[in-house]
From Swiss-Prot:
GO cellular component: nucleus
Domain of life from the UniProt record: Eukaryota
Residue ranges, compositional bias (Pro residues): 22-37
Native source organism of the sequence: Oryza sativa subsp. japonica
Bias (Low complexity) ranges: 7-21
Start and end residues of each stretch annotated as Disordered: 1-52, 277-306
GO terms, molecular function: DNA binding; mRNA binding; zinc ion binding
Claim: 4Fe-4S is one of the keywords in the record: no
PANTHER family reported in the protein's UniProt record: PROTEIN PHOSPHATASE RELATED (PTHR12506), ZINC FINGER CCCH DOMAIN-CONTAINING PROTEIN 12 (PTHR12506:SF46)
SUPFAM superfamilies: CCCH zinc finger (SSF90229)
Protein name: Zinc finger CCCH domain-containing protein 12
Length: 439
């Protein structure tokens, strides 16, 4: 028995191994065709089929369609004329709800999209964010296919902003447009998203503007002309508003005959513009008027002597413009002081400067001796080129160059009172640089 059992054991193992061997797999059945490609007889019948193969194919198709990426139901889709259009169907041509969708599915999608855009109808989706483009412009380039909310009462509400006098939007809740504050212009116009405050309280038509004060003239009309021209009047100067400060022109459009013209003093320093000896001329106060020679005439009888004859024509009355420049620069105590304003008393940015401009400007103590005209004397420094050429310096006591007391620059213009004009010309002619004019 034991030998027989030992002899039959390998046979049992062999049978078990042969029974456990895997069988080759059967080929998978081909996928069933979609319902749209079924025969007409099967599609036309409304009764459910009891064929197991048909039921299996139907279930496989539903499983494939529902497990896909979009889980879309194939057509046809219901047409419901009284309902709004299905936006997903208009965009993609498919609908995951199939025949159970409660929206309209028009056959011609392009025609439906075009008609919706013509009517200006946009979808209202309460749970979605609002379409920002629709809020700004009142339109939407996506039309009914846009996935955002389009409230009808807010159409273009973001674009309805108030404009300032220059046509730029006023947005107090936004930051100020830096480019507009510097230049007074904005290339984006009324579409800029920043704030554009008013630069002026009044335009050029306003006479009480703090930036452009009113101009008063002491004479409104000149004497009648002896020729064929009738009596003429001097026109009032017109000023163009600008974000920067502009000094009004001191020259009015007029016809000036040969003679002397009385203009306001050009001296901006505390002292005399051109110091001369007390024996030849009198010192003038800073507010006194000075004579401006329009032409130098050489007398024919005294031409060989090299002397310039005095002016024979009487002084011609010219309108005097009294300008009172107020402090138009902004005071910002919480900002640092404008260094240019503290040095010169002026600021090219005017009312739009972002720094502080105190009314009482503390002048720094000069570190050198000042000349009679209020300019610094720095013997060891380089000569101020602007002062050597024109006799003035816009930096005043703050200039870092030397301003020695010197004779005025030689030219056709001479400054001084009417009584001291001839002695001044004599002194200029005696200088070596005037030899060319006397030869």
């Amino acid at each position: 028995m034991d030998d027989a059992g030992r002899a039959s054991a390998p046979a049992v193992v062999t049978v078990t191994a042969s029974a456990a061997a895997p069988t080759p797999p059967l080929p998978p059945p081909p996928p069933p065709p979609p319902p749209s490609q079924l025969p007409a007889t099967a599609a036309a019948t409304d009764e459910p089929s009891h064929d197991p193969a048909a039921l299996y194919g139907e279930g496989m198709w539903q499983q494939m369609t529902m497990s896909g990426s979009g889980a879309m139901q194939p057509g046809p889709y219901p047409e419901r004329s009284g309902e709004p259009d299905c936006t997903y169907y208009l965009r993609t041509g498919l609908c995951r709800f199939g025949m159970s969708c409660r929206f309209n599915h028009p056959q011609d999608r392009n025609l439906a999209i075009a008609s919706a855009r013509m009517k200006g109808e946009y979808p209202e989706r309460m749970g979605q964010p609002e379409c920002q483009y629709y809020l700004k412009t009142g339109t939407c380039k996506f039309g009914p296919t846009c996935k955002f909310h389009h409230p009808r009462e807010k159409a273009g509400i973001a674009g309805r902003v108030q404009l300032n006098t220059l046509g730029y939007p006023l947005r107090p809740s936004e930051k100020e447009c830096a480019y507009y504050l510097k230049t007074g212009q904005c290339k984006y116009g009324n579409t800029c998203k920043f704030h554009h405050p008013e630069l002026f309280n009044a335009m050029a038509s306003s006479r009480g503007s703090p930036i452009y004060p009113s101009v008063h003239s002491s004479a409104t009309a000149g004497p009648p002309y002896t020729g064929t021209m009738a009596s003429w009047a001097f026109p009032r100067g017109s000023f163009i508003p600008s974000p920067r400060w502009q000094n009004p022109s001191n020259y009015a459009p007029m016809i000036v005959p040969q003679g002397l013209v009385q203009v306001p003093s050009w001296n901006s320093y505390t002292g005399q513009m051109m110091p001369v000896s007390s024996s030849e001329s009198r010192l003038q106060s800073p507010g006194a008027q000075q004579t401006y020679g329009t032409s130098q005439q050489v007398d024919a009888s005294a031409g060989n002597q090299g002397m310039l004859s005095p002016y024979r024509s009487s002084s011609y009355p010219v309108p005097q413009y009294a300008l009172q420049r107020e402090n138009v620069f902004p005071e910002r105590p919480d900002q640092p002081e404008c260094q240019y304003y503290m040095k010169t008393g002026d600021c090219k940015f005017g009312a739009v400067c972002k720094f502080h401009h105190p009314r009482v400007r503390s002048m720094p103590t000069p570190d050198c001796v000042l000349s009679p005209v209020g300019l610094p004397l720095r013997p060891g420094e380089e000569l101020c080129k602007f002062y050597s050429r024109y006799g003035i310096c816009k930096f005043g006591a703050n200039c870092k160059f030397d301003h020695p007391t010197m004779a005025p620059p030689m030219g056709v213009y001479a400054y001084g009172s009417a009584s001291t004009n001839v002695p001044m010309v004599r002194r200029l002619l005696q200088s070596p640089s005037a030899s060319a004019y006397t030869s």
